[in-house]
Amino acid sequence: MKKIVESTTFPRTKQSITEDLKALGLKKGMTVLVHSSLSSIGWVNGGAVAVIQALIDVVTEEGTIVMPSQSVELSDPKEWGNPPVPEEWWDIIRESMPAYNSNYTPTTRGMGQIVELFRSYPEVKRSNHPNYSFVAWGKHKNKILNQHPLEFGLGEQSPLGKLYIRESYVLLLGADFDSSTCFHLAEYRIPYQKIINRGAPIIVEGKRVWKEYKELEFREELFQEVGQAFEAEHNMKVGKVGSANCRLFSLTEAVDFAEKWFINNDSKNIKK
C-alpha cells in the first residue's frame, strides 16, 4: 500500500473514476465485460467500493456490468501444480471438497478485489458454474447468466456466447490482454481442439456430487499476443482511469479476430 500511495499524484475518488470512465468511452446502457486491477488505479478513496459505484453510475440500470468470477480451485486435484498434492490425497479431496455455491464460493484470488466485492452486491447475480462463473448487474443479467452449461463452460451457450450476440464491450481496467476471457470463445470455433475431462463438486437434486465434464484445453499463454495483434489492426478506446492503463473495445470484434488469428498463427494445431 505504501508504494501505491507514493506512486499516486492525487487521491482517486468515485467522482474522478467516473469522469475517467466516461472519457474512455464507457456510456449509459452499455453491456460491458470488465477485467480489473484495483492496485493499478492508484490509491482509491473507498477502494473497490468506489470503483464499483463509478461503474454503476456510468452504465446505469439500462446497461449491464459483467465480470468473470472464476473459482478454479474447485477442480480435480490431479490437475494441481501450484502446488501439487500427493496422489494419495486425491480421492479424499474429491470426496470432501465443498460444492460450488453461487452465494459463498469465493472467486480465485487472482481475479482481484473488485470482482470479489462486486459478487456480494445487492442485485448482482452469479451464474451456476463451479469453475467459470460470471457475475452481472443490470438490465440483461438474467439473459446473460441463466442456463450456464457445465460442459464447455466458456463456449457458445455460456455467458460469453450470449455477450457475443449482444454487441457487448470489454473493459480492461488496469488489466492486460492476457486476462481477456472473451478470447476463450474463439478457441471453441477453431478446427483444432483438444478436449479433456475435468471434475468439480456441485449440487445435484440437493445432494453434493463430484461431477466430471468435458472442456477444452485452453491456450491462455497466447492471449497477450492475440490482443496486441488485435490492437494493432483495430481502433479501440485507450486511456487512463486513475493511474491504470485501460482499453475499451468490441467483444464481438475481438472474438472474430482471435478466431482468425488462432487459425493462422497457432503452430500447435491440435487435432480432435
From Swiss-Prot:
InterPro entries: Amioglycoside_AcTrfase, Antibiotic_NAT-like
Pfam family name, one: Antibiotic_NAT
UniProt enzyme class: transferase
Superkingdom of origin organism: Bacteria
Gene Ontology biological-process annotations: response to antibiotic
Stored SUPFAM superfamilies: TTHA0583/YokD-like (SSF110710)
GO molecular-function terms, A-Z: N-acetyltransferase activity
Keywords: Acyltransferase, Antibiotic resistance, Transferase
Its EC number(s): 2.3.1.-
Sequence positions that bind CoA: L38, S39, S40, I41, G42, W43, V44, Q113
Family the entry assigns: Belongs to the antibiotic N-acetyltransferase family.
Subunit and partners: Homodimer.
Protein's job: May contribute to antibiotic resistance.
Name of the protein in its database record: SPbeta prophage-derived aminoglycoside N(3')-acetyltransferase-like protein YokD
